[in-house]
């Protein structure tokens, strides 16, 4: 798997993440494949997430973007009502490194230019990025960046994961 300016740049085989599928029963009947992941964070502690829970913001929010495999290419799914599903995972800063998140972080320093691509050295197990309490909210929505297509089923976990200040 490759990181491209801090995001996964290719359509990886789910085996690259350590599992063929993500074992999460969300009531969807479509086949989804991981497309990319990225994070949103702010310049102040507690103000980086795009979603809030009961009015509370979090330090950051990780998005794991999936596309519906009934479309041959991810680009075909972007503007379709059933095209995408995004797992939203809140992040707070804690005292210890998050071992799975570290697999991503340790390659950040190797990206010096906006279009540079680096390979992850270790398989990424997405299940290890999901909070222990798998309570989540789901709703139909849109991409949060242009072109803002209304093609996303959002699955946002209520509980956050913790990463270290160094990993932010």
Describe each PLM feature range.
Residues 1-168:
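Alpha-carbonic anhydrase
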């Amino acid at each position: 798997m490759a990181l491209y300016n801090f995001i996964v740049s290719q359509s990886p085989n789910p085996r690259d993440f350590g599992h063929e599928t993500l074992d999460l029963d969300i009531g969807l009947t479509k086949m989804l494949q991981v497309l990319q992941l990225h994070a949103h964070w702010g310049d102040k502690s507690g103000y980086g997430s795009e979603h809030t829970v009961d009015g509370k913001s979090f330090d950051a929010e990780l998005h794991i973007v999936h596309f519906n495999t009934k479309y041959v290419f991810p680009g075909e799914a972007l503007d379709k009502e059933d095209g995408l599903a995004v797992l939203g995972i809140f992040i707070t800063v804690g005292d210890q490194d998050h071992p799975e998140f570290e697999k991503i972080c340790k390659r950040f320093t190797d990206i010096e230019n906006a279009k540079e691509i680096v390979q992850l050295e270790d398989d990424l197990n997405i299940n290890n990025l999901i909070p222990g309490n798998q309570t989540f909210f789901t709703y139909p929505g849109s991409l949060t960046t242009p072109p803002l297509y209304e093609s996303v089923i959002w699955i946002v976990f209520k509980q956050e994961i913790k990463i270290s200040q160094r990993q932010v």
